[in-house]
Every structure is written in structure tokens, then in C-alpha cells.
Regions:
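Active-site metal-coordination/substrate-binding segment of hydrolases
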Residues: 83-152
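Histidine/acidic-residue-rich, glycine-tolerant segments that coordinate divalent metal ions
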Residues: 146-174
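Structured beta->alpha junctions
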Residues: 64-66, 120, 157
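Short alpha-helical patches at coil-to-helix transitions and adjacent helical residues
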Residues: 46, 124-128, 162
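Predominant activation on well-ordered alpha-helical scaffold segments within soluble catalytic domains
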Residues: 25, 50, 129-136, 166-169
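Active-site catalytic pocket residues across diverse enzymes, especially alpha/beta-hydrolases
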Residues: 78, 138, 142, 172
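N-terminal helical capping/dimerization or prosegment-like subdomains
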Residues: 2-99
Length: 174
């Protein structure tokens, strides 16, 4: 049986941080905090994702459900319109953090002893980074058999979702 630390990313074993870790750090440092109020913005993370996907063969759209509430949808059309679609779904907002309750800056994105510290590093910015880079790299291959592959990076998951996935379901169901 593996110990809980057996699968920990060992930053010291690599000559430099991976692109996935660096992108996750950038997403954390953007501090797209969603406290459920009106002064919320996922624009920094959404715009960073748009920059990552720029230049791919994907059909890329973004939707602003409200000022600052941007969701990004990228689609790679498949070769079989009857095949199921694969959706990679993530959210770009995080819940608030009380800095006094943290051992490190919750929005510092530091790697210390092989651990990435930061609000959203697990839920769900590391997944957003990894999925986005995998999608970008898959798009670069230029071979898209089967059904469509969709990357959906939504705003407002941490509160009600009404300005993220809920808004997309109502206004952009395709």
C-alpha cells in the first residue's frame, strides 16, 4: 500500500516546473474569488485560458453572462456526427480565503517541498490547467476521430452557477 505522500509531485526531481504547474500558479495568482456578491470577476482566468487556446484549430467562443462573468467554450469537431461528444468541464472561480488561516499566501501559488499551495489548487484550477493544455495539445495533432471534444471553462461554480453553467444552459445550450 502506498503512503499518502508516495504520489506527491516532487518539484525537486524536475529541472524546472512543468507547464501545468506554472499555469496553475498563474490561475491561483489571478485570485478569481467568488463570494457570491456582485464584485466578482473570472475575467483574468478566462482571458488566460483564451490566450492558451489561441492559435489552435478549435472553435473558441466566450460568453459574458454579466460584467466580469466570462465562460470559455472551445470545440474540436469530430469526424462522426453520430458519435458522443466528450466534454472537459471545469470552473475558473474559487471560494474566499482567510489569509490568517493559511500557512502560506492563499494566492501566492508557491511550490514548497513538492506541494503547490494556493486557493483552488485542488478545486479546481490544477484540473483547469491540465485539461486546457491537454486540449490544446490534442488540437495541435490535427487528428480528431469520433465525436466532438469540448472544453468548457465556466464562471460562477462556487456560488449559484447562475452566471456560469446555468446561464450557458439557458442561453447557449449547444
Amino acid at each position: 500500500m502506498l503512503s499518502p505522500r508516495a504520489s506527491v509531485y516532487d518539484a525537486g526531481a524536475l529541472p524546472a516546473l512543468t507547464e501545468e504547474v506554472e499555469l496553475t500558479q498563474a490561475l491561483i495568482r489571478n485570485a478569481c474569488v467568488n463570494d457570491g456578491g456582485t464584485n466578482v470577476s473570472e475575467l483574468p482566468n478566462a482571458d488566460l485560458m483564451l490566450a492558451i487556446l489561441d492559435g489552435t484549430t478549435a472553435d473558441i467562443e466566450y460568453f459574458d453572462a454579466a460584467p466580469g462573468r466570462r465562460s470559455v467554450i472551445a470545440r474540436l469537431p469530430g469526424t462522426d456526427s453520430t458519435a458522443p461528444t466528450l466534454m472537459l468541464l471545469g470552473h475558473t472561480d474559487v471560494v474566499p480565503a482567510n489569509p490568517d488561516a493559511w500557512q502560506r499566501d492563499p494566492f501566492g501559488g508557491e511550490v514548497v517541498d513538492g506541494f503547490l499551495w494556493g486557493r483552488g489548487s485542488l478545486d479546481m484550477l490544477s484540473y483547469v490547467a491540465t485539461m486546457s493544455l491537454a486540449f490544446r495539445d490534442y488540437a495541435a495533432q490535427g487528428i480528431h476521430r469520433g465525436g466532438d471534444v469540448v472544453l468548457a471553462l465556466v464562471a460562477d461554480e462556487e456560488a449559484l452557477g447562475s452566471q456560469g453553467m446555468g446561464w450557458l444552459q439557458e442561453h447557449e445550450p449547444d
